[in-house]
């Protein structure tokens, strides 16, 4: 920044470029806002929760958490550690059918919302 006694600092070119990048709204953000505003995001969250329970994924994650706690000792495990250890396994084990159904619903929403 260039400073002056008589006027506020003039931003450098790099600062201006960074400002433009911060102002850009991504397509992902637009879709997320529309999903929230319409209430469809909550519907999708409920759909995913139901499908993960139906396929046994939730039970698998509960078992994985319990095994990790048992292995490390109840007093030596924090919630943050449990999340750090279990999250990659959980994400990798979401069935493709659940991912496909969610993607299909999002695509249909985008088409119907004319985004």
UniProtKB/Swiss-Prot annotation:
One of the record's GO cellular component terms: DUBm complex
InterPro entries in the record: TF_ENY2, TF_EnY2_sf
GO function term, MF aspect, one: transcription coactivator activity
Sorted UniProt keywords: Activator, Chromatin regulator, mRNA transport, Nucleus, Protein transport, Transcription, Transcription regulation, Translocation, Transport, Ubl conjugation pathway
Subcellular location: Nucleus, Nucleoplasm
Superkingdom per UniProt: Eukaryota
Gene Ontology biological-process annotations: chromatin organization; mRNA export from nucleus; protein transport; transcription elongation by RNA polymerase II
Tissue specificity of this protein: Expressed in roots, cotyledons, leaves and upper part of sepals.
Disulphide connectivity of cysteines: none
TM regions (residue ranges): none
Quaternary structure and interacting proteins, as annotated: Component of a deubiquitination module (DUB module) formed by ENY2, SGF11, and UBP22 in Arabidopsis. Interacts directly with SGF11, but not with UBP22. Interacts with MOS4.
General function of this protein: Component of a deubiquitination module (DUB module) that specifically deubiquinates monoubiquinated histone H2B (H2Bub). Does not seem to be a component of the TREX-2 complex. Seems to act independently of the SAGA multiprotein complex. The DUB module is responsible for the major H2Bub deubiquitinase activity in Arabidopsis.
Family indicated by similarity: Belongs to the ENY2 family.
Protein name, as recorded: Transcription and mRNA export factor ENY2
Species assigned in the record: Arabidopsis thaliana (Mouse-ear cress)
Taxonomic path: Eukaryota, Viridiplantae, Streptophyta, Embryophyta, Tracheophyta
